[in-house]
Amino acid sequence: TMVAFLLEEVGLTLNDLDKFYVAGAFGVHLDIESAVTIGMYPDLPREKFECPGNSSLKGAYKLLTDRNLLSEIDDIVEKINYIGLEDAKDFIEKMRAASFLPHTNIDNYPTVKQKLLERGLL
């Protein structure tokens, strides 16, 4: 739900994503299949998921060891969008709807739906 909301806010869809990064120790130890099954993450092709580990530490290290990267920071900052959830229409309702496992709209999770059908659970 959060991913769908953020994509909608910037005018993109899941099909526009080349990669889906799950950073930090959480991402490294996460079972992607289980996370998709319960609706935590979108039902993307699994090869689109990247779990880079401690990406903030890796980024800081790269910047400290290659000062030429400083010139890229301004470009990156210009591309950042702030989205205030306090002003988001229907955000709370969408989050409540997403609290069901796997999700209130199973059609958003076609691989999960297929698994449930195969097991006779739908």
Where are these regions (language model features)?
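Acidic, glycine/GT-rich loop-and beta-edge segments that sit at the periphery of enzyme/chaperone cores
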Residues: K62-L122
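Catalytic phosphate/nucleotide-handling subdomain of diverse soluble enzymes
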Residues: M2-I76
